């Protein structure tokens, strides 16, 4: 009976270690994904500024030529 309790306790201990390692790995993967999202937002911010500047310089000329009132 004592050996069975000892082996069950050992299996429980191994199971809890395994679960904690899986949880740490999952948290690391989530942090990795969150970092990619932040990087994408930063790239989008860098991209939107120059595009808006270009659009504001080209749009009035295009409208003027489109309506032929230049």
Swiss-Prot record:
Residues 23-44 form a propeptide. Expressed by the skin glands. Its main location: secreted. The keyword Secreted applies. GO terms for biological process: antimicrobial humoral immune response mediated by antimicrobial peptide; defense response to fungus; defense response to Gram-negative bacterium; defense response to Gram-positive bacterium; killing of cells of another organism. The keyword Transferase does not apply. It is found in: Secreted. Keywords: Amphibian defense peptide, Antibiotic, Antimicrobial, Cleavage on pair of basic residues, Fungicide, Secreted, Signal. GO terms for cellular component: extracellular region. Residues 1-22 form the signal peptide. Has antimicrobial activity against Gram-positive bacteria S.aureus ATCC 2592 (MIC=5.0 uM), S.aureus ATCC 43300 (MIC=10.0 uM) and B.subtilis (MIC=20.0 uM), against Gram-negative bacteria E.coli ML-35P (MIC=50.0 uM), P.aeruginosa PA01 (MIC=10.0 uM) and P.aeruginosa ATCC 27853 (MIC=5.0 uM) and against fungus C.albicans ATCC 2002 (MIC=10.0 uM). Belongs to the frog skin active peptide (FSAP) family. Brevinin subfamily. This is Gaegurin-LK1.
């Amino acid at each position: 009976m004592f050996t069975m309790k000892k082996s069950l306790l050992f299996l429980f201990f191994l199971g809890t270690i395994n679960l904690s390692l899986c949880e740490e790995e999952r948290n690391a993967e989530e942090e990795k994904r969150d970092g990619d999202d932040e990087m994408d937002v930063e790239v989008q911010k860098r991209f939107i500024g120059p595009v808006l500047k270009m659009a504001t310089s080209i749009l009035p000329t295009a409208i003027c030529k489109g309506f032929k009132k230049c």
